[in-house]
Each structure stands twice: as C-alpha cells, then as structure tokens.
Amino acid sequence: TAQYEAAEQDLLVRVSQAYFDVLTSEDNLELVQAQKKAVGEQLASAKRNFEVGTATITGVRDAQARFDLSNAQEIAADNDLRIKRLALDLAVGLSNAKPKRLANNTKLIDAPTEDVSIWVTQSEAASPAVRQAQLGLEIASLEVNKANAGHKPTIDAQLSYAGARNLNGTATTALSSSNHVFSPSAAVVLNVPLFAGFTTMYRVKETVALEDKARSDYENVRRTTAQATRTAYFGLVAGLSQVKAYEAAEASSQSALDANKLGYSVGVNINIDVLNSQSQLYQTKRDLAKARYDVLVGNLKLRQATGTLTPADLQPINALLAP
C-alpha cells in the first residue's frame, strides 16, 4: 500500500504541474504578444516623431530592435506552449486538453500556520517512502532472528503408536484388541546443536549485514524526506511572499510606464525609457503569473512530502478555476 500511495501522490503532483505549466505558457505567450503590440505602437510613434523632427533616429532604432526581439520571444513562447500541451496530454491520457484558467481576482491559499517542525514530524510518520523503508528494516531484523535460531537448541514433541500381534493370548498391560496389542508413546526431545558447519554462521553474518544496510537506508530516507519537507515548506512560504511582492511591483511598474509615456509625449523622456518600462511591466506580469501557479503546486508538493496528499486536496484548487 505504501508503494501505491507514493505512486498516487506522484501522479497528482505531476498532472498538476503539467496543468499549470500549460497555463504559465499560455500567459507567457499572451503577455509577449501584448508587449509586442505595445512596442509596435511605440515604434510607430517614434517614426512619426522622427519624421517631424521631434525625435532622433536613435529612438527609432531602439524601438525597432525591441520589436524584433519581441518577434523572437513570441516564436519561443509559442513553441514552449506546444511542448507543454503535449506534456499535459501525455500526463492525462487525452488529446488537446484544455485547462481552465484561474478566476480573476482569485485569492490564493493561506500560508501554513504550523511550524516547519510539525510538518517534518508528520512526514516521518506518514510518508510512504519512510514507512516502506521502516518495513524493510523490520523484515531484515526478523531475518536476523531467524538465522540466529540455527545456533539455539530446539525442542521437538514426538508421538508414536505401535501395534503387535499377541500369539499366545496372554494378558498385557497395553491396549489390546483380540490378538493384537497397541502401544502408544509420547516423548519430548531436546536438540542441542554443537556444530552444524559454517553455513549457519555465514547466514547470520549475511543477515546482520543486510539489517545494517536496511537501517542505513531507513535513516537516509527519513533524512531525505525531512529535507524535502523543509524545502517544500519554505518554498511555499516564500512563494506566497513573492506573489505579494510581484503584485506591488506590477502596480509600481504600471505607474512608471504611465509616467515615462507622459514624459516622452512632452519631450522630457526618450523612447528607450518607455521601452524599458514596458519590458519591466510585462516581465513582472509574467513573473507574477508563474509565482501564483507555483504556490498552488507548492502546496501539493508540501503535502506530498508529508505523505498526506490525497485527491481531495485538489478540490480547493478546482474552486479557484474559472467556470
């Protein structure tokens, strides 16, 4: 059952990761296209200003270079989306799967309130990998006891029942029937092995070595699971903080872009200032979208690390998706 649970949890995380990878790629492509459109508008503006003599050729060249870069980014983003969709189709066993997006103004999950040590303790008790390694250690210990039993005395119970024919018909003290005499007997036999060769000794050494290996494997799995739990925990906490930071950065980047556009229109700023502000805004939007998806997957990875992930944990995520 531990192997089944581990496989089920791994499947849940892999499918969820593939699902949100597609959404990340879709957002990335849309934002690249939006940035390309904005750069194109800025390029057209720079050309007009150059033609009337209010801007230099440098502004046109800067905008053209940024527009050409946007073309390359669009091609890469489109290809990445195709690959991510193929990966999702493979994970779910369907063709042309259409994942739903997150609803607008979606509030993500809350940060875990428990201390990381509580999650680590839970992982050591519930993780399928830890339980499987512990079972392997217990079996190895039983094999050692079984091998050691070859050096120990054994007690056997023997029961016999003999019959003989009474030819002269004289009376006997044993059970008799007609001319036959039946003699039951019982005995307890103690066997003390003095020396049974080196087979038993070598078998004991082998099982002890296997037990040591099983114990080492168990400790390694336990430490690895604890480390994975801490990594998932701190990753989730940091991810939630990143989302808030990116939301603030998005608002600031939008304000900076608006200010640079206004400055450019009155001749205070140059074209490259607007282009840089556009690039920063759309990069922040992409980072924010990815951070939101990473938080949702990170929550599943934390539960997987502790061994408590079930299909029911997907329901809160489904509730965040647009209808």
What are these regions (language model features)?
Residues 10-122, 235, 239, 280-282:
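Periplasmic alpha-helical coiled-coil/stalk elements that build and connect Gram-negative outer-membrane
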Residues 133, 155-159:
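Membrane-embedded beta-strand positions of outer-membrane beta-barrel proteins
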Residues 17, 62, 154, 183-185, ...:
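Transmembrane beta-barrel architecture of outer-membrane proteins
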Residues 7-30, 41, 48, 84, ...:
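Amphipathic alpha-helical coiled-coil segments
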Residues 297-323:
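Gram-negative outer-membrane assembly/targeting C-terminal domains
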Residues 103-138, 193-194, 219-222, 321-323:
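Bacterial Sec-pathway N-terminal export signals of envelope proteins
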Residues 77, 128, 291:
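Metallo-beta-lactamase
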Residues 102-113, 145-146, 158-203, 316-323:
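Small/polar, glycine/serine/threonine/aspartate-rich low-complexity segments that form flexible
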